């Protein structure tokens, strides 16, 4: 009997530890801004980095030279969305970025979308697969909220080698006016924000020589409850 109780205790402790590890490794969109029991979370594709010329790169010409282009490749750990199953032949490329630094110092570079990319609904998280080169630079997501105000959200440190999924958590506005606002009852009925691109702040010690970075599969987890539960005969405030 004592051995049975000991085994049960060990199994219970292991399951709790595994759950905590999962929670710490990746943000749970269901708990981000969960002020209502009514949610309809959906993971949507924002961009697959398949179109040449749809992304632009910039950095100060005093600090170095930057270039970007598409390459054949894919993260092996990436799981396709349900609507993309069977269409793997349409998702075969990644965006490669190369930076050649002139000297070590406080540098940064931007990876910007050709045009702002809207994401409908109340966005909880934004994720992207990044192939790093084990240099301790920091990546930020650049967004524009419902009122056209620009914000940056920390995605993670690039001190790893190979592919890794980075996730930015979008914290809700506390009062509908401050912070990242995604909806307003006074100015329209379509919640969401726009993704402008990314900024990488370089570690001054490691910003030398050539640096390579690869991006793929930009996604968002968004709450579409308000959009999916509109009455069919409701009027649209878009005039």
Where are these regions (language model features)?
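Beta-rich carbohydrate-recognition modules and glycan-binding surfaces
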Residues: 20-239
């Amino acid at each position: 009997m004592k051995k049975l109780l000991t085994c049960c205790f060990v199994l219970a402790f292991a399951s709790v530890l595994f759950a905590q590890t999962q929670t710490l490794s990746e943000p749970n969109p269901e708990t981000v801004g969960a002020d209502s029991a009514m949610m309809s979370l959906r993971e949507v594709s924002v961009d697959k980095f398949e179109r040449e010329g749809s992304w632009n790169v910039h950095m100060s010409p005093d600090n170095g030279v930057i270039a970007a282009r598409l390459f054949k490749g894919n993260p092996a750990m990436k799981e396709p969305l349900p609507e993309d199953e069977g269409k793997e032949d349409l998702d075969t490329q990644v965006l490669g970025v190369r930076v050649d630094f002139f000297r070590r110092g406080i540098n940064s570079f931007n990876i910007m979308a050709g045009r702002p990319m809207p994401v409908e609904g109340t966005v909880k998280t934004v994720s992207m697969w990044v192939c790093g080169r084990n240099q301790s630079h920091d990546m930020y997501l650049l967004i524009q909220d419902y009122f056209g105000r620009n914000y940056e959200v920390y995605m993670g440190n690039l001190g790893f080698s190979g592919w890794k999924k980075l996730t930015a958590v979008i914290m809700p506005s506390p009062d509908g006016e401050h912070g990242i606002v995604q909806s307003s009852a006074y100015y329209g009925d379509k919640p969401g924000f726009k993704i402008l691109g990314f900024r990488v702040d370089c570690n001054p010690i490691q910003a030398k020589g050539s640096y390579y970075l690869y991006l793929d599969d930009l996604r968002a987890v968004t709450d579409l409850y308000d959009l999916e539960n509109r009455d069919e005969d409701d009027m649209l405030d878009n005039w």
